[in-house]
């Protein structure tokens, strides 16, 4: 049980802060007031550079995203801001209507959000809403056109961050697939070099157009995770409840539908690139470089699928070597 918990923490680089510095969880009114008055993010589109998320808040978001299955879910994050940094201390779900491509926040969700935050303040928790999160089941962490519009609207009222979690890739890879983003002002155009620096990620063919159309409207923030002394106790209690499922489940079976979709998507991308090569024979120059880039992306997608499948097979093999025949051995020894 402890090994599984430690493995999860190491995989996601969760660091333990000094117990004497647990004051990071306390709302710093002076810093918040100073930043709210000066509003440095209005002068620098890249002012916020990182997001620090508590381990418990991350678990809440991942479990919520996983519970939605193939449907998108949505929630709110609480915390505060520091210079250049968002600190997320907690998260809660929102009662929203979700589909396989979007989430729609209705009046009921807005009323629930106001009521929840008011109850927190009455209980002495002064953290503000610093961002929203939602899931992208199976198609990566990025902002769609609707997400960009939602984030633009939220940023008008103050500092806000958008977090995206892919529950399917999280289960398949064994590491939380998460991204944090902020949108640029309408009158700002990022340099071309900055757009090219973005790390390549696998996007399904049916989402590629939406991904490419809005990729220049936002930028990503570095995400780091932390836990306090109290978080350690809470995580232990959570693991007492879920460690059996961790050992008994196999990512190959849990995400078999996702794996099938990924291989189908890869075959479609391969056929598309092959048709492009056949219709435009290589003649040297820039077109050849474009084809090479397309082939390289297909190869990367295939390598990622293979690595996740191999990891699942290795996990199943380790469990079989550890637990297969234990009951039989005990019976023989008792006789």
Curated annotation (Swiss-Prot):
GO cellular component, one term: cytoplasm
Cross-referenced Gene3D superfamilies: Cytidine Deaminase, domain 2
Binding site for Zn(2+): 134, 136, 147
One Pfam family linked to the record: CSN5_C
Motif (JAMM motif): 134-147
GO MF: deNEDDylase activity; metal ion binding; metalloendopeptidase activity; metallopeptidase activity
EC number(s) reported in the record: 3.4.-.-
Top EC class, one word: hydrolase
Places the protein is found: Cytoplasm; Nucleus
SUPFAM superfamilies cross-referenced by the UniProt entry: JAB1/MPN domain (SSF102712)
InterPro entries in UniProt: CSN5_C, JAMM/MPN+_dom, JAMM_MPN+_peptidase_M67A, MPN
GO biological process: cleistothecium development; hyphal growth; protein deneddylation; protein neddylation; proteolysis; regulation of cell cycle
UniProt entry keywords in alphabetical sequence: Cytoplasm, Hydrolase, Metal-binding, Metalloprotease, Nucleus, Protease, Signalosome, Zinc
Domain MPN residues, every copy: 51-187
Effect of residue 136 to A: Inhibits fruit body formation
Subunit structure: Component of the COP9 signalosome (CSN) complex.
Free-text note regarding domains: The JAMM motif is essential for the protease activity of the CSN complex resulting in deneddylation of cullins. It constitutes the catalytic center of the complex.
Family note: Belongs to the peptidase M67A family. CSN5 subfamily.
Function: Catalytic component of the COP9 signalosome (CSN) complex that acts as an regulator of the ubiquitin (Ubl) conjugation pathway by mediating the deneddylation of the cullin subunit of SCF-type E3 ubiquitin-protein ligase complexes. The CSN complex seems to link protein degradation to sexual development. Required for fruit body formation.
Name by which UniProt lists this protein: COP9 signalosome complex subunit 5
């Amino acid at each position: 049980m402890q090994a599984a918990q430690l493995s999860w923490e190491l995989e996601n680089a969760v660091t333990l802060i000094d117990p004497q510095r647990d004051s990071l969880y306390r709302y710093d009114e002076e810093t918040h007031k100073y930043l709210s008055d000066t509003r440095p993010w209005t002068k620098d589109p890249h002012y916020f550079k990182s997001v620090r998320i508590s381990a418990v808040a991350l678990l809440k978001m991942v479990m919520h995203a996983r519970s939605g299955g193939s449907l998108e879910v949505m929630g709110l994050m609480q915390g505060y801001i520091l210079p250049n940094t968002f600190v997320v201390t907690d998260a809660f779900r929102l009662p929203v209507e979700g589909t396989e491509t979007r989430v729609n926040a209705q009046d009921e969700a807005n009323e629930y959000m106001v009521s929840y935050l008011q109850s927190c303040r009455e209980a002495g928790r002064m953290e503000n809403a610093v961002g929203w999160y939602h899931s992208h089941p199976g198609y990566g962490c990025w902002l769609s056109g609707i997400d960009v519009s939602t984030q633009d609207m939220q940023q008008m009222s103050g500092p806000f961050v958008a977090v995206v979690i892919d529950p399917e890739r999280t289960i398949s890879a064994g590491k939380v697939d998460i991204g944090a983003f902020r949108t640029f002002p309408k009158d700002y155009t990022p340099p071309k070099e900055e757009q090219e620096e973005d790390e390549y990620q696998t996007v399904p063919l049916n989402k590629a157009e939406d991904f490419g159309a809005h990729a220049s409207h936002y930028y990503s923030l570095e995400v780091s995770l932390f836990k306090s002394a109290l978080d350690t106790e809470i995580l232990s209690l959570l693991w007492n409840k879920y460690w059996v499922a961790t050992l008994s489940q196999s990512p190959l079976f849990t995400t078999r539908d996702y794996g099938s979709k990924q291989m189908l998507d890869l075959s479609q991308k391969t056929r598309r690139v092959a048709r492009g090569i056949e219709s435009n024979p290589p003649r040297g120059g820039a077109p050849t470089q474009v084809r090479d880039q397309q082939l390289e992306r297909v190869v990367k997608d295939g390598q990622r699928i293979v690595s996740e499948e191999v990891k699942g097979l290795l996990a199943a093999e380790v469990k079989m070597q550890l637990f297969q025949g234990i009951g039989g051995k005990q019976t023989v020894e008792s006789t």
